[in-house]
């Protein structure tokens, strides 16, 4: 699959190389080549939970989440590759030199970062499937936070071990695992007669203390509750994305400001819902939109290590 991604990345770079002007056109995301790349990347993520049992509705929503995430990541890659079209003197490079110069982008995003993303999506999907089963029982049982119980457990995550609360407690909306890159924590149902509930305020305090390292608040989400593999605020978005109507499916109500990330996000979400011919028409007004958002990209390598 790595070779297929690189092959599609190269094809997408050919389309990027043909662009004229000083600004990256967001409409490139609707091109056949970009769509092939986004779908291939999304398919890799989907493969992480192919054997996980869940309802078809949940699976489709998680797969859609992967598509949106992959689309915004692709936007990032195009954004990073675009300046490499010109050499140090401002002259257009040959395609061979350009492709060689952007090869490190492919390696960084679609090998290094993808490994961490694959593991996170897999954990999110497994926990989303669990949440779906938990909801069938309502508050009949308590839910209890568990770590992997070995020497690799982060001390911060160990702070939450044993927290026991009803499924309806707001704690689970913020601190349901996975709680970071490579998090192996889980949640299980326990009998109310066997385990006393944790005080809500105490649980919230322990959760906030445990995730203090996540100062951006990226991992404060519940994959099962939101039916998404990745939080709306992730390395390829900005903080206010958490409260955007688009993330709640209200596409028609959204006012898209003069912001290239918002425009790209709306296009990607529309692409997830429509066929290519319709999208190519809708993408035309976005051509020429400038990509100059100072709020991203985050240093993803640092986030993985945190």
Spell out what each predicted region is.
Residues 1-106, 191-306:
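N-terminal leader/targeting and assembly helices and adjacent pre-domain segments
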Residues 42-45, 103-108, 141-151:
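A broad, low-specificity signal for short, low-complexity segments enriched in glycine/proline
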Residues 87, 95-98, 103-139:
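Internal glycine-rich, Lys/Arg-flanked active-site/core loops of soluble domains
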Residues 121-195:
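Conserved short secondary-structure elements within globular domains
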């Amino acid at each position: 699959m790595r070779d297929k991604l690189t092959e599609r990345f190269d094809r997408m770079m050919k389309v990027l190389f043909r662009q004229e002007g000083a600004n990256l056109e967001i409409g490139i995301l609707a091109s056949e080549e970009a769509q092939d790349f986004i779908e291939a990347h999304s398919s890799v993520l989907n493969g992480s939970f192919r054997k996980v049992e869940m309802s078809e509705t949940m699976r489709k929503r998680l797969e859609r989440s992967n598509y949106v995430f992959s689309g915004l990541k692709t936007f990032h890659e195009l954004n990073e590759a675009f300046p490499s079209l010109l050499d140090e003197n401002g002259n257009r490079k040959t395609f061979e030199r350009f492709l060689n110069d952007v090869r490190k982008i492919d390696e960084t995003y679609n090998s290094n970062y993808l490994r961490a993303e694959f593991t996170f999506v897999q954990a999110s999907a497994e926990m989303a499937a669990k949440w779906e089963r938990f909801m069938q029982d309502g508050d009949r049982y308590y839910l209890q936070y568990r770590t992997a119980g070995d020497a690799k457990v982060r001390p911060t995550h160990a702070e939450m071990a044993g927290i026991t609360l009803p499924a309806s407690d707001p704690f689970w909306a913020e601190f349901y695992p996975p709680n970071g890159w490579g998090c192996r924590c889980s949640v299980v149902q326990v009998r109310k007669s066997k385990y006393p509930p944790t005080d809500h305020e105490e649980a919230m305090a322990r959760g906030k203390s445990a995730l203090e390292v996540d100062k951006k608040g990226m991992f404060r989400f519940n994959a099962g509750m939101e039916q998404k593999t990745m939080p709306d605020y992730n390395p390829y978005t900005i903080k206010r994305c958490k409260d955007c109507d688009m993330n709640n499916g209200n596409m028609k109500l959204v006012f898209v400001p003069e912001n290239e990330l918002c425009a790209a996000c709306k296009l990607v979400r529309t692409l997830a819902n429509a066929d290519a011919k319709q999208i190519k028409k809708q993408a035309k007004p976005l051509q020429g939109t400038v990509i100059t958002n100072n709020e991203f990209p985050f240093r993803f390598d640092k986030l993985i290590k945190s």
